[in-house]
């Protein structure tokens, strides 16, 4: 029943003019250089207008601009992506609790190359999503440098979702 009430409230907000989802690229920086990552394609957000400019800000200015955009568009759900969003760890440590207090459900998509703060587990409405490219051999072949073991260490103790890009090589692999 709790989930149904939440769904009804979300639909009410959408019908009243709120955006269902807002995806924010808060940085293009990333310590990895994974093949196929859109973050390094110069034109990947050419049509997005003001959203692309968020990646140009840091510190309190980034926090203020994200909050202003969220207040203006009133989304039900915010997805925070990058590059690697954890590059802006300090800003996220301020931003995530504020978005939660505003009643915004947030999805943070990360490679988990940095340890996830334990305190984030207590933030209501926050879903951590970790990008993994298959099991260890496949993942480490695609990532530069190999990160599978590091991810396991960095996500330990967290409840999260996994985002996996399925490639042609995975599908065609013998025994799949």
Enumerate the language-model features and the residues they cover:
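Conserved strand-turn element in the central/C-terminal portion of the radical SAM core barrel
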Residues: 154-174
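Structural detector of well-ordered beta-strand residues that form the stable sheet scaffold
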Residues: 107-109, 129, 161-163
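Glycine-enriched alpha-helix->loop->beta-strand junction motifs that scaffold or abut catalytic
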Residues: 123-128
